[in-house]
């Protein structure tokens, strides 16, 4: 049971690197909290944004609003 728990925690820590999500070192240390360094909290669905990194998780900024998309956000 202990090995399973350790494996699960390791997977959670490595997931952002596997998915290609960009994080600074200090963001990774915040244990998955939805906080962006220097900009406060990330924006949720249908909240205002100016760029993709303003939005939480897999949400994309489209027309200054965080939305769910079928494909990944462009990296610009």
From Swiss-Prot:
Primary location class: secreted
- What are the residue ranges of the propeptide? 21-39
Question: What's noted about domains in the record?
Answer: The cysteine framework is XI (C-C-CC-CC-C-C).
Under the heading InterPro entries, the entry gives:
Conotoxin-I_CS (IPR013141)
| Compartments reported by the entry | Secreted
Leader peptide range in chain numbering: 1-20
Gene Ontology cellular component terms for the protein in this record: extracellular region
What GO biological process terms are annotated to this protein in UniProt? defense response to bacterium
Q: Which UniProt keywords apply?
A: Antibiotic, Antimicrobial, Disulfide bond, Secreted, Signal
Q: Tell me, in a sentence or two, what this protein's role is.
A: Antimicrobial peptide that potently inhibits growth of Mycobacterium tuberculosis (H37Rv strain) (MIC=3 uM).
Bridged cysteine pairs (disulfide): 42-56, 49-61, 55-66, 60-73
Q: Which domain of life is it from?
A: Eukaryota
By what name is this protein known?
Conopeptide X11.1
Q: In which tissues is it expressed?
A: Expressed by the venom duct.
Query: Which family does the entry's similarity section mention?
Result: Belongs to the conotoxin I1 superfamily.
């Amino acid at each position: 049971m202990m090995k399973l728990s350790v494996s699960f925690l390791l997977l959670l820590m490595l997931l952002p690197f596997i998915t290609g999500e960009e994080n600074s070192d200090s963001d990774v240390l915040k244990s998955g909290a939805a906080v962006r360094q220097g900009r406060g909290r990330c924006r949720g669905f249908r909240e205002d944004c100016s760029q993709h990194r303003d939005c939480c998780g897999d949400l994309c900024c489209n027309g200054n609003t965080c939305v769910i998309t079928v494909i990944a956000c462009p990296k610009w």
